[in-house]
Amino acid sequence: MVKIGVHVSIAGSIARAVERAMAIDCDTFQIFSRNPRGWTFKPLAEEDAALFQGALGTSGIGPAVVHMPYLPNLASPKEEIWRKSVEALTEELHRCSMLDVPYLVTHLGHHMGEGIGAGEGRVQQAIDAAFSQSDPGSSRVMLLLENTAGEKNSVGSRFEEIGRIRESCSDPDRIGVCMDTCHAFAAGYDLRNEVGLSRTLEAFEDGIGIEHLHVIHLNDAKADIGSHLDRHTHIGLGMIGEEGCSGILTHPTLASLPFICETPEDAVRDNAANIRAVRRLAVPRA
């Protein structure tokens, strides 16, 4: 059975995220471990972490995935921003360890005009610094590097960029990949049909290695292929379309992975409706 979920809120308490995921029939889910829009945060209380672990353990769903906050920029050439980004990454690894969450997803950031090579180097240095500063329990957490749509100065839109960063880090075994389908499509990887998907997975294998793919952010794309626009839309209703989304969900290399949707909630569909759409498309076509 394909594992399908969405990003859910932690409003009220982090343990309530499990209830919210169960209420809309998630098999897996993603959260922010704290307010994602600021640098400051409250420490995660041991009691709250224990409540989350207990709720998750009895729910029968998982894996749970934590996403890094919005502000960190691991590729930044600005020392203060880079240092704060390393601190944020170190803290999130610790929080994942407390929550017993196996995966932490991070964007790689922007090089601010310094060039892709410089950006890759800063990301590698940031990851190594966070790993060296983190507590021993954090070594159980796998850091997943997420591909980008290829917006200006971004790092990680090409699979080979992610592969180079991973291989250059001091402990690559602690690093995997989360592939966002909208971002990949916007970056120029075709996912609309079987031929396009096969070529995209070949590029992933060549650039990174398919064995390092652990989570898929399943999002349809509002903008066309190669647009470099990060615009998510409802599953099957965008430019990737039903055929493309179904092909991703049923591909034998991908079908066993957790699929997490980061789609809008609006008058067209809410999260529950997108999950139902994904389940329908996850049935292999005759």
Swiss-Prot record:
<keyword id="KW-0862">Zinc</keyword>
<dbReference type="GO" id="GO:0003677">
    <property type="term" value="F:DNA binding"/>
</dbReference>
<feature type="binding site">
    <location>
        <position position="230"/>
    </location>
    <ligand>
        <name>Zn(2+) 3</name>
    </ligand>
</feature>
<feature type="binding site">
    <location>
        <position position="146"/>
    </location>
    <ligand>
        <name>Zn(2+) 1</name>
    </ligand>
</feature>
<keyword id="KW-0479">Metal-binding</keyword>
<dbReference type="InterPro" id="IPR001719">
    <property type="entry name" value="AP_endonuc_2"/>
</dbReference>
<dbReference type="InterPro" id="IPR018246">
    <property type="entry name" value="AP_endonuc_F2_Zn_BS"/>
</dbReference>
<keyword id="KW-0378">Hydrolase</keyword>
<dbReference type="GO" id="GO:0008081">
    <property type="term" value="F:phosphoric diester hydrolase activity"/>
</dbReference>
<feature type="binding site">
    <location>
        <position position="180"/>
    </location>
    <ligand>
        <name>Zn(2+) 2</name>
    </ligand>
</feature>
<dbReference type="Pfam" id="PF01261">
    <property type="entry name" value="AP_endonuc_2"/>
</dbReference>
<dbReference type="GO" id="GO:0003906">
    <property type="term" value="F:DNA-(apurinic or apyrimidinic site) endonuclease activity"/>
</dbReference>
<keyword id="KW-0227">DNA damage</keyword>
<keyword id="KW-0540">Nuclease</keyword>
<dbReference type="InterPro" id="IPR013022">
    <property type="entry name" value="Xyl_isomerase-like_TIM-brl"/>
</dbReference>
<comment type="similarity">
    <text>Belongs to the AP endonuclease 2 family.</text>
</comment>
<feature type="binding site">
    <location>
        <position position="107"/>
    </location>
    <ligand>
        <name>Zn(2+) 1</name>
    </ligand>
</feature>
<dbReference type="GO" id="GO:0008270">
    <property type="term" value="F:zinc ion binding"/>
</dbReference>
<feature type="binding site">
    <location>
        <position position="217"/>
    </location>
    <ligand>
        <name>Zn(2+) 2</name>
    </ligand>
</feature>
<keyword id="KW-0255">Endonuclease</keyword>
<dbReference type="GO" id="GO:0008833">
    <property type="term" value="F:deoxyribonuclease IV (phage-T4-induced) activity"/>
</dbReference>
<protein>
    <recommendedName>
        <fullName>Probable endonuclease 4</fullName>
        <ecNumber>3.1.21.2</ecNumber>
    </recommendedName>
</protein>
<feature type="binding site">
    <location>
        <position position="67"/>
    </location>
    <ligand>
        <name>Zn(2+) 1</name>
    </ligand>
</feature>
<feature type="binding site">
    <location>
        <position position="232"/>
    </location>
    <ligand>
        <name>Zn(2+) 3</name>
    </ligand>
</feature>
<feature type="binding site">
    <location>
        <position position="146"/>
    </location>
    <ligand>
        <name>Zn(2+) 2</name>
    </ligand>
</feature>
<feature type="binding site">
    <location>
        <position position="262"/>
    </location>
    <ligand>
        <name>Zn(2+) 2</name>
    </ligand>
</feature>
<dbReference type="GO" id="GO:0006284">
    <property type="term" value="P:base-excision repair"/>
</dbReference>
<feature type="binding site">
    <location>
        <position position="183"/>
    </location>
    <ligand>
        <name>Zn(2+) 3</name>
    </ligand>
</feature>
<dbReference type="InterPro" id="IPR036237">
    <property type="entry name" value="Xyl_isomerase-like_sf"/>
</dbReference>
<keyword id="KW-0234">DNA repair</keyword>
<comment type="function">
    <text>Endonuclease IV plays a role in DNA repair. It cleaves phosphodiester bonds at apurinic or apyrimidinic (AP) sites, generating a 3'-hydroxyl group and a 5'-terminal sugar phosphate.</text>
</comment>
